[in-house]
Each structure stands twice: as C-alpha cells, then as structure tokens.
C-alpha cells in the first residue's frame, strides 16, 4: 500500500511538472485563479442570483440525467435483469394468495429499514449541508418511546399503530419494571438502520479521494484540494481547526482500522476528513467501511441512545420541568406549556387525547413542527445551490480547457 501511494505521488508530481513546464504556468497565479473561481461559484445562491441559480440547477439535472442514461444504455443486460426482477416482485405483490401475509410482513420491515437508512444517508451526505435527521427524527422517536415506556410501564406497544403512533397496551406493567436495557432494545432496529445509513453516506469522500489518488489527476473536489493543501502546510498549521484536522489525519493514517473506528464512534464533524484520508492513502475498502459501520451503527448509536434515554427518563424530565418553574419571574409561565405538553402526551398514550389539551394548541409542538419545516426547506435550498454551483464549475472547467488548447 505504501509503494502504491508513493508511485501515485511520483506520477502526480511528474504530471504537475510537465504541466507547468509545458505551459509556463505560475503556481501562484493558478491558485489565485482557483480562488477567484471558487468565490464566483459561492455567490451562485438563490438569495443572491435566483434566476441564474435556478437555471444552472435545471441544467445540472439535465446533465446528470444524460450521464445516467448513457451509463444505463451501456449496461443494458443489468437494466433488463433489474426490470425482470422488478416485474416478478410486482406480480408477487399484487397476486392474491396465501403468500400475502409474508409479503405484507416483508413490506413493513423493508419500508421501516429503508426509511431509517435513508434518513441516515441524508444526515451524512447532505449535498453541501447535513440534514440533521438525528435531531429531527431519530432523537425525538427515542425520546417518545422513553416517555411512553415510563408512563405505560411497558414497551409492548400495540402494532399497529406502532411505530407510527405510540399508545399504551391494554395490560400495563407494574411500576419500576422498565429498565434502560428494555428501552435500548425497543429502539435498536431504528437506531442501527440509521447508523448504517450514516456509514453509507461516508463512502463518497472515500471513493472520490481514492479515484483521484490512483489516477494521479488533479481532483475536482474542493474538500480534497483543501486536504492536499493541509498536508503541504502541515508544519505551519497554527489554528485549532487545522491542528484538529491534522490530528484526525494522523490518527487514521498511523493507527488504521482502530483509528477509523475511534473517529467513527465519537460524534465529530471531521469524519469526512477520515474518509478522504483513507481514500488518499489507499486504505482497503473493507477496512474503512467495516470500521465505519461498527463505529457508527453500533458504538456511536448506543452512546447517543443512552444519552437520549437518560435525558428523557421520567425523573429527569420531572426535575427539568420543576427547575424551569423555579426560574425567578418567568418560571411559572415557562413551566406551564411544558406541563400541558407532557399531560397531553400521557392522555394520548392512554387513548384519552380528546380529554386533554389538543397537541396543536401547545406552542412547543408548534415550534418543533416549524423547526422541522425550516430545516427541511434549508436542506432543499442547499441542494439547489450545490447543484447550481456544480454546473458553474462545469462551465469554468470547459473554459479553462479551451484556453489551454489555444
């Protein structure tokens, strides 16, 4: 692996020398031009240039569709096999018979797994910004299960409506029968699938860096370019962010599997750098993905689950509400909506929602719903901006290639 990396470095250095010698290009002017182009792309956002952003976004979609159509056309055998398999599955799904009970069971599990894996992928990939699906979906789900478990003294919620809606079973348990482990077991599938999704979402930086290293070509990805610049100026790094990135890079490079496992197991915003580092230094795929999967889907998820469950356990919640009420002056007015919300949730769990305050009238529920809407809208806007900037980068690359051929 070290020899491969050394050969790739030598090949890239040779290509850079040839490029500079052949075209008499000053490296400083090249870097300045790249900086200007990056600033131009960053200005292409909906709130600054809405018409151009929407135009470039639409054109980028057309380019991507054209590329995928071409790829599928050159893989006709795979496409035909997939369509035949899809036809068999559709026929099995709609044809009546004794197999329908198994089909419905498989469909339910498949949709559940796909939902949480998809949210995990969205949380990692983000296309420019992460949709924090743990804070918006998985965390609230674990909190709801925790509150319901302590209220019902059971985790055997009726299915259906669980997991879409949580209500207490007809035969509730006795006080004190709920343990931390029982709640962890109840939400294990959702949390594990979400963790698998986040691990899958970390693959693009790895594959991008690996392909750039093996080809010896100049990478197009800005994060990878920043990574190479960081390696070049490693000794002169002074600020905390640069030192933290270098620490992650050295940990992954020197420790290998267990270094990747450590980075994946601890919630941190620098794990993308671990994927780029592994790809750049040609770490084997299963070493990277195996460590990432174990770290994110098992270790990290259990840390996050335990934190949420403890935070929303019955006595902690009661203490937090009491603490809010003790705030001088505004305490009682702040405490009231929390008490109303918790009371409404208890009544819903016991099929008595019509007797309590409707959830829609509670400002806590209203604020959380609006927060979800705002974050999802921001995520969609970031995708539009990111794709528009990708098309702008295509234009810049085409113009640069035309200048070189003149």
From Swiss-Prot:
Q: How does it sit in the membrane?
A: Multi-pass membrane protein
Q: Which stretches face the Extracellular side?
A: 65-77, 131-250, 295-305, 385-406
Show the stretches that span the lipid bilayer.
44-64, 78-98, 110-130, 251-271, 274-294, 306-326, 364-384
Bias (Basic and acidic residues): 1-21
What are the subcellular locations of this protein?
Endoplasmic reticulum-Golgi intermediate compartment membrane; Cell membrane; Vacuole membrane; Endoplasmic reticulum membrane
| Chain residue ranges for the region called VTT domain | 173-316
- What is catalysed by this protein? a 1,2-diacyl-sn-glycero-3-phospho-L-serine(in) = a 1,2-diacyl-sn-glycero-3-phospho-L-serine(out); cholesterol(in) = cholesterol(out); a 1,2-diacyl-sn-glycero-3-phosphocholine(in) = a 1,2-diacyl-sn-glycero-3-phosphocholine(out); a 1,2-diacyl-sn-glycero-3-phosphoethanolamine(in) = a 1,2-diacyl-sn-glycero-3-phosphoethanolamine(out)
Cytoplasmic side residue ranges read 2-43, 99-109, 272-273, 327-363
Q: Where is this region: Disordered?
A: 1-35
Q: Which family does it belong to?
A: Belongs to the VMP1 family.
Domain text from the record? The VTT domain was previously called the SNARE-assoc domain. As there is no evidence that this domain associates with SNARE proteins, it was renamed as VMP1, TMEM41, and TVP38 (VTT) domain.
How would you summarize the oligomeric state and partners of this protein?
A: Interacts with BECN1. Interacts with TJP1. Interacts with TP53INP2. Interacts with TMEM41B. Interacts with ATP2A2, PLN and SLN; competes with PLN and SLN to prevent them from forming an inhibitory complex with ATP2A2. Interacts with ATG2A.
The function of this protein is: Phospholipid scramblase involved in lipid homeostasis and membrane dynamics processes. Has phospholipid scramblase activity toward cholesterol and phosphatidylserine, as well as phosphatidylethanolamine and phosphatidylcholine. Required for autophagosome formation: participates in early stages of autophagosome biogenesis at the endoplasmic reticulum (ER) membrane by reequilibrating the leaflets of the ER as lipids are extracted by ATG2 (ATG2A or ATG2B) to mediate autophagosome assembly. Regulates ATP2A2 activity to control ER-isolation membrane contacts for autophagosome formation. (Microbial infection) Host factor required for infection by all flaviviruses tested such as Zika virus and Yellow fever virus. Probably required post-entry of the virus to facilitate the ER membrane remodeling necessary to form replication organelles.
Protein's name according to its UniProt entry: Vacuole membrane protein 1
